[in-house]
């Protein structure tokens, strides 16, 4: 998700999917007219407007699922928006609205900031 999507992220994330699903044939994608496309490897909708997508295969771990509500997955495909990702790196300069969005709490988000390069220190 990117900074341009903060409002819809907050709205969809604050809405109960259970409440929406009580209407026949409704889910959050339909209720909020979220546009999707098909993944390359997994039969799951990929949300349009993001800057990256991961397709995953669930790793069955029933104990983790039941005891901790924890799900583990293996990434089997990845895509990224070429406007901000190339040569194995993110390049957000000039695309502030596409900076990745990170939820903090209570409707507050951070977007990824300026790059900082580290140097190897000699000891």
PLM feature segments, named:
Residues 1-123:
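Basic, polyanion-binding surface patches
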């Amino acid at each position: 998700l990117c900074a341009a999507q903060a409002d819809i992220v907050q709205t969809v994330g604050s809405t109960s999917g259970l409440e929406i699903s009580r209407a026949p044939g409704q889910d959050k994608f339909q209720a909020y007219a979220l546009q999707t496309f098909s993944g390359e490897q997994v039969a799951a909708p990929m949300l349009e407007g993001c800057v990256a997508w991961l397709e995953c295969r669930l790793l069955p771990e029933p104990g983790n699922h039941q005891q901790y509500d924890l799900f583990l997955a293996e990434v089997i495909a990845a895509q990224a928006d070429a406007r901000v990702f190339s040569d194995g790196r993110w390049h957000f300069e000039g695309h502030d609205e596409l900076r990745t969005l990170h939820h903090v709490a209570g409707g507050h988000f951070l977007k990824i900031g300026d790059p900082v390069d580290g140097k190897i220190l000699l000891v």
